[in-house]
Regions:
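A solvent-exposed, acidic/Ser-Thr-rich amphipathic alpha-helical stretch
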Residues: 206-210, 214-262
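Short, solvent-exposed alpha-helical surface patches in non-cytosolic proteins
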Residues: 38-44
């Protein structure tokens, strides 16, 4: 497959998934933990907006801050599709002549830059589909082409912090491709549920927390020793959160690490507060969670002794 065709098809694959995002999904979590659906779309739209000046010889200094901040406006789908169309047109016009482009790390061959763009569109297209319940299937031909290009670059990208740790191989070409880019090929509703649950606790938002738990949820508190206290049902669990956030001085939960495996999740956290005398306090612990259809049905908490 020639490079322009590869690029064109990966951008179209991305655009198809953008076009399917519903109005109520823009704030949802994605496999890119720091980005919402809108953040992810803005990132790729920014790449598309940068493509034209870079492929036509502009330097980073000449472009300046033109593409900083929000690029999506009131119509994120249209903004993203317009940027994608312009980028496709530019690459088709400029790639045949070859040459170099000016990137953040220096001058790079145009072919290499376009390969980078193709990879980003393909992987982020999957990210977007996973986040929005879209079509997770990637074109096997595109997966093969990008995976072949990436094989000699994977460790370089990982060492530079561009991608996360590699996930375990799956034996499936698409799964192994995503794992190489630091993606969990099984990312789905439970991962999204954990991200929302952690964010709700971080915000101290009891209503948001309870909206992410089942009506028959169970919470087992750490204390008192040795077995803690078991709270059953949404009403009982809600009362615990109301007391926790209402009676604690400046409560603040911070996620330190999390992962999901099937219907189970683990969330490692730190809880900070301020005592009545103004002195700070904190404790660190772990939640072992069980999910049902993306909602938390069990939360068992364990605190460092």
């Amino acid at each position: 497959m020639d490079l322009n065709t590869l690029y064109h098809r990966t951008v179209e694959s991305w655009a198809d998934r953008v076009n399917a995002v519903r109005a109520d999904q823009w704030d949802g979590p994605t496999p890119c933990r720091e980005w919402s659906v809108r953040d992810l779309t803005n990132h790729v739209t920014g790449e598309d907006r940068w493509t034209t000046p870079l492929m036509r010889g502009s330097t980073l200094e000449e472009v300046g801050d033109r593409f900083d901040g929000d690029l999506l406006g009131d119509d994120p789908i249209q903004a993203s599709l317009d940027a994608a169309r312009e980028a496709i047109r530019t690459v088709a016009e400029t790639l045949p002549a070859g040459g170099t482009v000016h990137l953040s790390y220096g001058e790079e061959q145009m072919d290499e830059y376009v390969h980078q763009l193709a990879a980003d569109h393909l992987v982020h297209g999957w990210d977007l589909a996973a986040a929005t319940g879209g079509d997770l299937r990637l074109d096997p031909a595109l997966v093969h082409e990008v995976a072949t290009w990436f094989a000699d670059r994977e460790e370089l990208y990982r060492a530079g912090g561009v991608i996360g740790p590699s996930e375990a191989p799956t034996g499936d070409p698409q799964g192994d491709f995503l794992a190489a880019f630091g993606r969990d090929p099984h990312w789905g509703p439970n991962h999204a549920g954990l991200a929302r649950f952690s964010a709700a606790f971080g915000a101290g938002d009891v209503e948001a927390v309870m909206s992410l738990m089942t009506d028959d949820c169970v919470f087992e508190a750490t204390g008192p020793a040795p077995d803690g206290v078991r709270h059953e049902g949404a009403e009982a669990v809600r009362a615990v959160w109301v007391e926790l956030f209402g009676d604690t001085g400046s409560p603040a939960f911070t996620e330190e690490e999390s992962f999901v495996a099937g219907d189970r999740g683990v969330l490692r956290w730190r809880f900070d507060w301020v005592e009545d005398d103004g002195s700070p306090g904190h404790v660190r612990g772990v939640d072992v969670l069980r999910f049902r259809a993306g909602l938390v049905c069990e939360k068992f908490s364990y605190v460092k002794g």
